[in-house]
């Protein structure tokens, strides 16, 4: 029998084993901060030569990261022991095999005010009384992927400006898809533009990550969708230890798509992603995509009439269904269909800001973002926030927006 709302997690192993695993993780964490290669590598079992090589490369790259803090915390209370019989058989020479969730928590000096928090699925093996880490990819076939960072892909180098830190892999030659030399200057100007829209306080030090290609990008994002239609991403970790807070805000570039952009295109993209970073701490579980993406586009184009040229041509051709885009329409369909959803969202938010003002929109966004996990759908909470801000619900807002398009 079970009661509603009550779940049972089987804790992996005796407390003495969990305590020993945590001590192992503490030593590994200290080795990262102390840049102690010997101590770091001593935490690794020698069962997989590939894993040992990857860990050696990881440590070498992490030396280039200015960590303000770094911790690994075993969390058996999350999902218990995830090791299957097949995982245990894989390490037949071990006395014991455990795969609990491990939280990786860290801060980059000068940029993170809260812990970035991500899950790692280490396989811990016990042999001759000693626990070590044997692998971090044994659960990939279950789509339980360990977090991958830019430094997992090899050595990195840093570039700085007043409010930005950019990490990328060293690369020279014509095959490199690296941002231009004026990239950080453009980022600084884009941030100033964003501040004219998002007037609420936010932490204005931003990290930009530049992977080598879409394969590395997809692994960092744990994405299964086609990334070719996307130039950059605003990425945040979710800290389950502190009420599902968004932390560890980053902008991650798609280098393959980025290289074809004009200077103005780069500026617009940066402003869009920075708006997401600026609003992230005010967002919440009931924020629809059209509100987020629409406001980012409004801030990015900053009143430029060309920003809605595609949408206007669609309307002129009679291709306008008078409906606000739904969340799934921003990630599925053709590139043209996805772009159309962004344009519709931009038009809707532009309508809101034009009629009721930017400050009213900021208040509306913050009110909607404050909605805690509670009964009711996203539509319910959105409807409630709209009524509080402008005196009309979702359906009436949608009709008013559509009418403004038809009568323009």
Where are the model-predicted features located?
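A short hydrophobic beta-strand element
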Residues: 85-106
């Amino acid at each position: 029998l079970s009661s509603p709302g009550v779940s049972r997690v089987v804790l992996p192993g005796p407390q003495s084993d969990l305590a020993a695993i945590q001590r192992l993780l503490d030593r590994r964490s200290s080795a990262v901060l102390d840049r102690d290669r010997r101590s770091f590598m001593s935490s690794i079992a020698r069962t997989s030569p590939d894993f040992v090589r990857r860990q050696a490369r990881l440590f070498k790259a992490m030396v280039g990261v200015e960590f303000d803090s770094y911790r690994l915390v075993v969390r058996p209370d999350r999902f218990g022991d995830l090791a299957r019989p097949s995982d245990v058989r894989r390490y037949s020479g071990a006395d014991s095999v455990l795969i609990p969730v491990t939280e990786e928590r860290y801060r980059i000096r000068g940029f993170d005010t809260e812990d970035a928090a991500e899950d790692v699925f280490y396989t811990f093996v016990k042999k001759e009384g000693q626990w070590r880490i044997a692998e971090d990819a044994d659960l990939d076939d279950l789509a339980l992927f360990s977090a991958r960072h830019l430094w997992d892909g090899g050595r990195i180098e840093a570039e700085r400006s007043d409010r930005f830190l950019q990490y990328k892999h060293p690369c020279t030659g014509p095959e490199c898809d690296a941002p231009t030399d004026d990239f950080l200057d453009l980022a600084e100007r884009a941030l100033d533009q964003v501040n004219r829209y998002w007037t609420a306080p936010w932490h204005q030090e931003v990290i930009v990550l530049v992977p080598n290609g879409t394969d590395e990008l997809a692994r960092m994002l744990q994405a299964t969708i086609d990334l070719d239609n996307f130039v950059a991403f605003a990425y945040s970790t979710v800290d389950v230890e502190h009420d599902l807070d968004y932390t560890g805000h980053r902008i991650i570039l798609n280098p393959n798509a980025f290289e074809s952009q004009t200077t103005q295109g780069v500026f617009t993209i940066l402003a869009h992603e920075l708006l997401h970073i600026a609003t992230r701490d005010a967002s919440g579980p009931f924020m629809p995509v059209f509100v987020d993406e629409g406001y980012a586009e409004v801030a990015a184009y900053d009143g430029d009439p060309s920003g809605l040229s595609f949408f206007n041509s669609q309307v002129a051709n009679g291709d306008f269904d008078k409906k606000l885009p739904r969340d799934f329409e921003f990630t599925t369909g053709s590139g043209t269909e996805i772009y159309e959803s962004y344009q519709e969202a931009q038009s809707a938010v532009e309508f809101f800001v034009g009629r009721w003002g930017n400050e009213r929109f900021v208040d509306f966004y913050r009110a909607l973002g404050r909605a805690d996990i509670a009964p009711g759908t996203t539509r319910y909470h959105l409807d409630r926030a709209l009524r509080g801000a402008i005196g009309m619900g979702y359906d009436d807002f949608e009709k008013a927006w559509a009418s403004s398009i038809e009568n323009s």
